[in-house]
Amino acid sequence: MINAGELRKNTKLMIEGEPYVMLEVQFVKPGKGVAFYKCKMRNLMTGSLLERTYRSGDTFEPAALEEKKMQYLYAQGDEYYFMDVKTYDQVMLTEEAVGDAKEYLIDNLEMDILFFENKAIGITLPNFVELEVTQADPWVKGDSVAGDSKPVTLQTGMVLQVPPFVEEGTIIQVDTRTGAYVTRVKK
């Protein structure tokens, strides 16, 4: 069982028989009364949001989710296809289930696919991915007017703020948790 004090972002638990993932957990200690946790979570089956408050003594059942290592294959319309790296079985996820992770999906990227009752319901990206810069404005050395970052377009279509020395064709590392530039990748 999970105690309310152990709730953190990305904690997966069962509420009313359905799996949820915590998006935000805020500890509130009012001047009078009992302290509580204000929680915002997403239903992993339907994608709907739920906001609830819980007391410190409340307990929860951990979500019975299975994670399988899979590889991204391709997208067709709003369907995304993945392959199990051990059995070569393929699964399909909708654009809704993939969510913002679609900004990081490149061919052959390995990640964990979440399964609930043998049904694929979501993905867990690796913390860092390497993406190629496909469009970047040129940088003039000594140009301090432009500031310390510039927008570039990555191979997935994502637009990201990067340091001015990053050029078109450069491979960069991006943190999938924050969506921020990390470093250039030397190949």
UniProtKB/Swiss-Prot annotation:
Signal peptide range: none
CDD domains the UniProt entry points to: S1_EF-P_repeat_1 (cd04470), S1_EF-P_repeat_2 (cd05794)
Pfam family for this entry, one: EFP
Keyword match Protein biosynthesis: yes
Keywords associated with the record: Cytoplasm, Elongation factor, Protein biosynthesis
One record GO biological process: peptide biosynthetic process
Gene Ontology terms, MF aspect: translation elongation factor activity
Compartments it resides in: Cytoplasm
GO cellular component labels: cytoplasm
UniProt pathway annotation: Protein biosynthesis; polypeptide chain elongation
Family the UniProt entry places it in: Belongs to the elongation factor P family.
Known role: Involved in peptide bond synthesis. Stimulates efficient translation and peptide-bond synthesis on native or reconstituted 70S ribosomes in vitro. Probably functions indirectly by altering the affinity of the ribosome for aminoacyl-tRNA, thus increasing their reactivity as acceptors for peptidyl transferase.
Protein name: Elongation factor P
